[in-house]
């Protein structure tokens, strides 16, 4: 049961960290390529 409560306490933290990383990546992509319609990859 202790392992299950540890999982419940770490899953939201890992979710928050991963969502923050994805949001930061999207912000940086939009900073370097402001208009996605004209970005030539």
Swiss-Prot record:
The chain crosses the membrane at residues 7-27. It is found in: Plastid, Chloroplast thylakoid membrane. Pfam families: PSI_PsaJ. It is a single-pass membrane protein. GO terms for cellular component: chloroplast thylakoid membrane; photosystem I. This is Photosystem I reaction center subunit IX. May help in the organization of the PsaE and PsaF subunits. One of its GO terms (biological process) is photosynthesis. Belongs to the PsaJ family. Keywords: Chloroplast, Membrane, Photosynthesis, Photosystem I, Plastid, Thylakoid, Transmembrane, Transmembrane helix. The keyword Acetylation does not apply.
